[in-house]
Amino acid sequence: MTVDTSTSRKQFLIRSENMSADDFGELYTRMFGNLYSGMPRPERPVAIGGVYGRHEGGSFRRLSFRGDLLTEMPDLDDEITFIFPSAGRVVFNQSSDRVGMPGVGLAMEKAQVRSVGFIDGHAHHGLSVRRALFARRLAMLLGRPITHKVRFQPRVDLGSEAFQGIKAIVAMATGNEFEMLIRSSALMPERLQEMLVDSVLDSWPHNYSEALRRPAPQIAPRHVRLAMEYIQQHP
């Protein structure tokens, strides 16, 4: 296990090689606060491997689970999580279960999830983002306030190339080379977050997708505006 050990910046990255779920949770609490403290302990030993990072307003991860893990979900300030499974199954318990598996991606609103299970040697790439970050970015891109909550399509076919860009950014962020970039740039965590937000808004279907794809309004040349004003004044 290693963490980002830079002394000049807040630590936000965990690298684990088959750390026990208890040890992973303890390290998480030390680095990010007691978000998951008080959760029931696993009934059987579970090992967690991979990389987990959390920066203001979101997280990214590439994790694998050796053993089945069922855990409750804490209140995560209206975060939306996106899962790209590569092995096993992940089961989110809401009013009904939603199951992610290789080829099937999920977008889940964590506030509506009661518990989540990682089953059958589950592994995935994933990220979580606060809804407010999506709303802020959409307002900037569309040039107007966002009046409705952004809602993402809950289940997608990962066979579509559109989703590979998101996964590639997560893979880059959880790769060994990225740690060098983190240590060399204090702005990198924020830039990474911007890349993830933009790639999700661009690729994962949501209720503002159509608005984003509309061509931006163009300013007509002055002579065109004058002609239009004349026509309006002299019908």
Language-model regions, residue ranges each:
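Alpha-helical bundle regulatory/interaction domains
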Residues: 2-39, 43, 91-235
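Conserved hydrophobic/aromatic beta-strand scaffold that supports enzyme active sites
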Residues: 52, 60-62, 82, 105-107, ...
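Conserved short histidine dyad/triad with adjacent acidic residue
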Residues: 11-16, 41-54, 58-75
